[in-house]
A protein has these predicted regions:
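NTP-dependent nucleotidyl-transfer catalytic core
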Residues: 1-215, 277-293, 301-398
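C-terminal subdomains that position terminal phosphate/3'-OH groups for nucleotidyl transfer/ligation
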Residues: 239-265, 271, 275-304
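Glycine-rich, Lys/Arg-enriched anion-binding loops that position phosphate/diphosphate groups
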Residues: 170-268
Length: 398
């Protein structure tokens, strides 16, 4: 590889946890072509700051002159235990498109060449559907189950659609004509046969070629574990959260002094703030101190070292992370404020829950309590006590 190809390769490979079959990409770069990479996202819950990871990777891929496609996987949102009901899925796809575009633009990368494809636009074609049937006849039920174990919601009497999900995701590589698929490391079992069978083993069964796979690390959540859309509102930061909400959530986050592992706050610095700072051109993370010069970092290794020594304490780290996140999210929020369409689609994609007003139960004190109106007394007395049998039943069942 010449130095230009090497620089492109390094950008593609940066900040990854795993890169499978890199030789596929190397060959394309040596031939001075543009690798075609796709990232799929099931259009379900509201995207949180964890979406910065794929978005920053997409920004790097665009800079490395890759052809990038974002698959708005509406059908997958529905196949996965109905996480996104069919009637909301279209609006959610538009919401995701706006979010991903704004995320990539927030680090100054042009999105005019970023391609968006809606899953349902090709996953219902006769060719695609026939491939689903062919693959379903060649892949065992247990392999499909294992492949989806970390991605598809696991329930007792799971719907059959959860077994189709991995088959469709694997076929997308072929039908989107990709050289490489990007995903979080949680997608690993869908990507490779080690330890389970999926894309790299299933595609050749239909005569299709094996693709490269690039995997982002998973962010630790603010409560310590992997960040997920199904976390409670306090454990994840929504991209449209106000500065106060961001500060409050980070302040509450689990962040033990000197402990670097599974630390959600440090995970933000490592996986979001540094890669974004590099794309933004300054490459720095600053921590202000009250009585001393600010600490200025240019690598996560230095940050972790100082944190382990308690020179960088949770008390000074947290406000620095809040401030940096708020300024990183500012252009996304400005884009939202400036777009009446986006605001309208938000309401349609995530309709506020209908609150059933609680009607205050008026205690039935009967008609004989002191002060009861005399005229009510008679008819009430004449009526048989309707509640009595239920009350008895409830008592016996206790
Ligand atoms: N499995 C991805 C979504 C996805 C769907 C289809 C694909 O082809 C790729 C990715 C997720 O967890 O969100």
């Amino acid at each position: 590889m010449d130095s230009e190809a090497q620089a492109r390769f390094d950008l593609i490979a940066s900040n990854l946890q795993e890169f499978l079959n890199p030789e596929i990409i190397e060959k394309i770069l040596i031939e001075k072509r543009s690798p075609r990479v796709y990232w799929g996202t099931a259009t379900t819950g509201r995207p949180h700051i964890g979406y910065f990871l794929p978005a920053l990777k997409i920004a790097q891929l665009l800079k490395a002159d890759c052809e990038v496609t974002v698959l708005l996987a509406d059908i997958h949102g529905f196949l996965d235990n109905l996480k996104a009901p069919l009637e909301l899925v279209d609006n959610r796809a538009i919401y995701y498109r706006n979010v991903v575009t704004a995320l990539v633009q927030s680090v100054g990368v042009d999105t005019s060449k970023l391609n968006f494809v809606l899953g349902s636009s090709y996953q219902k074609s006769p060719e695609y559907v026939m491939d689903v049937y062919r693959m379903a006849s060649m892949v065992s039920e247990s392999a499909a189950k294992k492949a989806g174990a970390e991605v598809v919601k696991q329930t007792g009497n799971a719907p059959l659609s959860g077994l189709l999900y991995p088959i469709l995701q694997v076929l997308d590589e072929q039908h989107l004509n990709a050289d490489c698929q990007l995903g979080g490391v949680d997608q690993r079992k869908l990507f490779t046969h080690n330890p389970y069978s999926a894309a790299t083993e299933w595609l050749p069964k239909l005569g299709y070629s094996v693709r490269a796979h690039i995997m982002n690390p998973m962010m630790a959540g603010l409560g310590g574990q992997k960040m997920s859309s199904s976390d409670g509102a306090d454990a994840k930061i929504d991209l449209l959260d106000t500065a106060e909400a961001v500060a409050k959530k980070i302040k509450k986050a689990e962040c033990f002094p000197k402990i670097v592992e599974d630390n959600g706050v440090l995970s933000i610095v490592e996986n979001i703030l540094f890669p974004a700072a590099v794309l933004n051109g300054h490459g720095e993370f600053r921590v202000e101190r009250r009585d001393a010069e600010p600490l200025v970092y240019t690598s996560i290794a230095q940050v972790k070292e100082d944190y382990a020594k308690d020179l960088l304490t949770p008390q000074i780290l947290k406000p620095a992370v809040s401030a940096a996140m708020v300024s990183l999210m500012a252009p996304i929020q400005a884009a939202y404020e400036a777009s009446a369409d986006w605001q309208e689609i938000t309401l349609k994609a995530y309709p506020p829950p209908v609150v059933h007003k609680k009607v205050k139960k008026v205690k039935d004190r009967g008609s004989r309590f002191p002060g009861a109106k005399q005229e009510n007394a008679k008819p009430e007395e004449a009526k048989p006590a309707e509640d009595a049998p239920t009350e008895q039943l409830a008592q016996t069942s206790i």
